[in-house]
Amino acid sequence: MPTPFAPLKNDTFLRALLRQPTDYTPMWMMRQAGRYLPEYRATRTRAGSFLGLAKNPDYATEVTLQPLDRYDLDAAILFSDILTVPDAMGLGLYFVDGEGPKFERPLRDEKAVQALKVPELDSLQYVFDAVTQIRTELKGRVPLIGFSGSPWTLACYMVEGGGSDDFRTVKAMLYNRPDLMHHILQTNAITVAAYLNAQIDAGAQAVMMFDTWGGALADGIYQQFSLHYMREVMKHVKTEKEGVRIPSIVFTKGGGLWLNEIADVGADAVGLDWTVNLGAARAQVGDRVALQGNLDPSILFAQPEQIRTEVEKVLMSFGKHAPGSGHVFNLGHGISQFTPPESVSVLVDAVHELSRSLHA
């Protein structure tokens, strides 16, 4: 029995992803529910830990909605972590203050890799419960985005056992034992597709795949070990539910050189970091995909008038909208935890105000 969610009042974000006409350029921010907000920090304290926050649907709902109560954003994104997936695979996720995520049982040898299996999604029910609860609490204000890490980005953490400056362990496996790396990536691809589909079933109205570390790979290697598996995911992710289109976004940080290939991965939109010229990107992809991005998050430490100037540059770089074009304004990566919350108000208002003339 379908859950009777409220009708959507603001579908601007979804329309932009599908390259349909909009009155203005919609916007949201990667990590918009996060540590830069005092209300997030208060909820995080109540939850007791990051995992206490992410694994509790009530807390996850609360923090997902916090930026929407403060700013006129055009989408909500599920509050979760990409590493919930390898955690469900039995790698033992934990967090160390000041060091970030770690795994108790990283994939360091053939035995560990061969034992890796696609997990039962029941162990991620807390994520799907959060999706349904958030969608219900949104009451149709804006669409809800579900997400996952890409197969390669998840593999980086699974092999390294945490974050890394140089990815030497995972790259050594990639070059020395490509068979083991392909086994990990194939397992991840099957899991990520199922995970995104379960989020769609739970109420997500769009989905995004974060390939945060794709840009760490060499040309040629990226295509084999990251792009190929994102394409595998996209082949199996639902594009509609109950007759309604579910748009998808892929984002490789540092992937500007491969934009032409990423545009053919099977997603509706491609995210860009701040190193890419948006106008040149639009010319390159044509009307194959919408684009998302790509303001440097550090601009939010500047004065309000400078923020408005840089917003206008991004909007003008994309240019006037035409049939078949689509742009979702976003940062080129996640918002910094040190960002002044009032800078985000300036950003959101500037995007909405300055973009209207480009949609006339």
Curated annotation (Swiss-Prot):
- State the reactions this protein catalyses: uroporphyrinogen III + 4 H(+) = coproporphyrinogen III + 4 CO2
Q: Does the keyword Cytoplasm apply?
A: yes
Naming one, the record's GO cellular component terms include: cytosol
Subcellular locations according to the entry:
Cytoplasm
State where it is primarily located: cytoplasm
Q: Which domain of life is it from?
A: Bacteria
Q: Which residues of this protein are annotated with the site description Transition state stabilizer?
A: D81
Task: Provide the top EC class.
Answer: lyase
Q: Which residues bind substrate?
A: R31, Q32, A33, G34, R35, D81, Y157, T212, H333
Q: Which UniProt keywords apply?
A: Cytoplasm, Decarboxylase, Lyase, Porphyrin biosynthesis
Question: What are the BP-aspect GO terms?
Answer: protoporphyrinogen IX biosynthetic process from glutamate
Q: Could you tell me which pathway this protein works in? A: Porphyrin-containing compound metabolism; protoporphyrin-IX biosynthesis; coproporphyrinogen-III from 5-aminolevulinate: step 4/4
Q: GO: which molecular function terms?
A: uroporphyrinogen decarboxylase activity
> What's the family?
Belongs to the uroporphyrinogen decarboxylase family.
Q: How does it assemble?
A: Homodimer.
Entry-linked NCBIfam families: hemE (TIGR01464)
| Function, in words | Catalyzes the decarboxylation of four acetate groups of uroporphyrinogen-III to yield coproporphyrinogen-III.
Q: What is this protein called?
A: Uroporphyrinogen decarboxylase
The record lists the organism as: Herminiimonas arsenicoxydans
What taxonomic ancestry is recorded? Bacteria, Pseudomonadati, Pseudomonadota, Betaproteobacteria, Burkholderiales
| Gene name tied to this protein | hemE
